[in-house]
Amino acid sequence: MELRPYQWEVILPALEGKNIIIWLPTGAGKTRAAAFVAKRHLETVDRGKVVVLVNRVHLVSQHAEEFRRMLDKHWTVTTLSGDMGSRAGFGLMARSHDLLICTAELLQLALNSSEEDEHVELREFSLIVVDECHHTHKDTVYNTILSRYLEQKLKKAEPLPQVLGLTASPGTGGATKLQGAIDHILQLCANLDTCHIMSPKNCYSQLLMHNPKPCKQYDLCQRRAQDPFGDLIKKLMNQIHQQLEMPDLKQQFGTQMYEQQVVQLCKDAAEAGLQEQRVYALHLRRYNDALFIHDTVRARDALDMLQDFYDRERTTKTQMVRAESWLLKLFDDHKNVLGQLAARGPENPKLEMLERILLKQFGSPGHTRGIIFTRTRQTASSLLLWLRQQPCLQTVGIKPQMLIGAGNTSQSTHMTQKDQQEVIQEFRDGILSLLVATSVAEEGLDIAQCNVVVRYGLLTNEISMVQARGRARAGQSVYSFLATEGSREMKRELTNEALEVLMEKAVAAVQKMDPDEFKAKIRDLQQASLVKRAARAAHREIQQGQFLPEHVQLLCINCMVAVGYGSDLRKVEGTHHVNVNPNFSVYYTTSQNPVVINKVFKDWRPGGTIRCSNCGEVWGFQMIYKSVTLPVLKIGSILLETPRGKIQAKKWSRVPFSIPVFDILQDCTQSLSELSLD
């Protein structure tokens, strides 16, 4: 499989064993170029071993196809991802294959594992390929892995693998001035330990010929001239504000700023023990969500979301404070009027504009395939329903489906990773002609026939803009940005265009740097990064040592009943936090049906949802780990009562006490008879 001249140009330093970043536009063949580097590496390096890291599960199989096409049959290739379930250990798989394609999270777990079959060291690989390497920053999994690499490099302890980064959009890191953008690019190079960021120079004209940009159009609409449904929602929010008796609370309903305000109010109220204030804040957030949905899709979709929320409140809450009863009555008193307004209210101008775009594109001769990008799973689900209910869209042969993340929350729909793969394949095969997608499809998704991309009212950064645009792969493709005239989304898209130009200037400036100056700068940045990481680790250690675990009580976030102590908690696989006290079971009830988690795990499977037996608040779910059933707690459902007051932590990693790793023998032997066995 031959490379194009511009691909040859960008991989030359990598063929010499140097660490580089390949910067090519989406659709220009970064993966094929990387596969060729891997092939040459295995052919020339004694006992070479390659690992390809991706940040999305669906990219594992997509990349495997590309690498297998490039490699000779005698090179063994395997894939590992979070949806594989029971499998051999990561270490065993790595040691028995020449090339491994996996999600970065699995490599990180293997690096930290103490099990011989699972554990692996970076030195066991001779080449690391980092797909979408612009994510190598801050505390991402990519950067955690590469920080380990840098620590070993600066210690000069052992030979290290070659690094090859791939990106279409290094970004500006939030910078709006050239020097800030240059600093961001240099930091990315330092994090990946690269000596060059490579893009075509001599073969640039050939790149443009093979990879033309889609035609961009701004499709702008006006706001609803009248909005009785939205006005009534805001009136109800005003009534809740009156109950709160907080005149300083800003009433910028339907904005992200307002959402942040009520989220903070909810946290502050929980820590102050103000149950009713917390409940009002929670419900205000739901009404604000309804305004978001109403602005994006239809009033009936917003009302359906509110109805689902209040139905769940009724069926799950076994104990209610006065505020909850008042809020339920408020909704009940107005839901019929809201229903009438939703049924006869004006159509959303954004949907009318979207219909015109789709009719024009899909009504043209030829085979059209498109992707609509939207902000949330909820709006993706609502858009799909709307698409299926428009007779005129059916007449032009639109066959839509959703492509969303594999999460699981009570507030939104979700897809299994198997579902994702099937949808992507059906889109490739032409069984489906239109995807309604969240950001899960922005990066790496390679469908050559896709010729229409619509960004539907999105407020994102320049990287997301470049990535979404790059899904339009076919010739004469159209990239539509659909938003309300004068909206924040429109202003942000214009800013993104300016930032894309700034990014290109910053990369060019870094490429022109004197090699010695570049090396010195990278070395300084790497040393500074490790110092900062060590300082953060020391800070975390101090933070986690503030209190003894047995001095911290665990309270239900809703009813504030004490249900355990910090000393009851253990960590499983680094991310799940379980309560190992056998007496804890008296404080919760369990649903009969297991929760849906859209992965199959190696050592455990999910059980039922667990709820506070006093008030019905959802705390988490059961984990059946190596036949032992353990309750997993969500940090958002637990309030911590410390010797200095109540705390609602955002993450378990930020609680003010240490949580040891779960040891099945030590933690379960004494009370095994009392624990539930599968």
From Swiss-Prot:
Pfam families: Helicase_C, ResIII, RIG-I_C, RIG-I_C-RD
InterPro entries named in the record: Helicase/UvrB_N (IPR006935), Helicase_ATP-bd (IPR014001), Helicase_C-like (IPR001650), P-loop_NTPase (IPR027417), RIG-I-like_C (IPR041204), RLR_C_sf (IPR038557), RLR_CTR (IPR021673), RLR_Helicase (IPR051363)
Domain comment in the entry: The RLR CTR domain is capable of inhibiting dimerization and signaling of RIGI and also facilitates binding of dsRNA.
GO process annotations (BP): cytoplasmic pattern recognition receptor signaling pathway; defense response to virus; innate immune response; negative regulation of innate immune response; negative regulation of MDA-5 signaling pathway; negative regulation of RIG-I signaling pathway; negative regulation of type I interferon production; positive regulation of MDA-5 signaling pathway
Compartments reported by the entry: Cytoplasm
UniProt protein name: ATP-dependent RNA helicase DHX58
Quaternary structure, from the entry: Monomer in the absence of dsRNA. Homodimer in the presence of dsRNA. Interacts with RIGI (via CARD domain), MAVS/IPS1 and DDX60. Found in a complex with RIGI and IFIH1/MDA5. Interacts with ANKRD17. Directly interacts with ATG5 and ATG12, either as ATG5 and ATG12 monomers or as ATG12-ATG5 conjugates.
UniProt-annotated binding residues for Zn(2+): C556, C559, C612, C615
Keyword terms, alphabetized: Antiviral defense, ATP-binding, Coiled coil, Cytoplasm, Helicase, Hydrolase, Immunity, Innate immunity, Metal-binding, Nucleotide-binding, RNA-binding, Zinc
Short motif DECH box, span: 131-134
Catalysed reactions listed for this entry: ATP + H2O = ADP + phosphate + H(+)
Family named by the database record: Belongs to the helicase family. RLR subfamily.
Listed GO MF terms: ATP binding; ATP hydrolysis activity; DNA binding; double-stranded RNA binding; RNA helicase activity; single-stranded RNA binding; zinc ion binding
Segments for region (RNA-binding): 572-655
Domain Helicase C-terminal span(s) in chain numbering: 353-514
TM region positions: none
Tissue distribution: Highly expressed in mammary tissues. Expressed in liver and testis. Expressed at lower level in spleen, embryo, mammary gland and breast tumors.
Gene induction: By interferon (IFN), virus infection, or intracellular dsRNA.
Domain called RLR CTR: residue spans: 542-669
Binding site for ATP: L24, P25, T26, G27, A28, G29, K30, T31
Top EC class of this enzyme: hydrolase
Domain Helicase ATP-binding: 11-188
Entry-linked PANTHER family: ATP-DEPENDENT RNA HELICASE DHX58, HELICASE WITH DEATH DOMAIN-RELATED
Gene Ontology CC terms, in alphabetical order: cytoplasm
Gene deletion effect: Embryonic lethality at a high frequency. Adult female that survive show an enlarged uterus filled with fluid resulting from vaginal atresia.
Coiled coil: 489-546
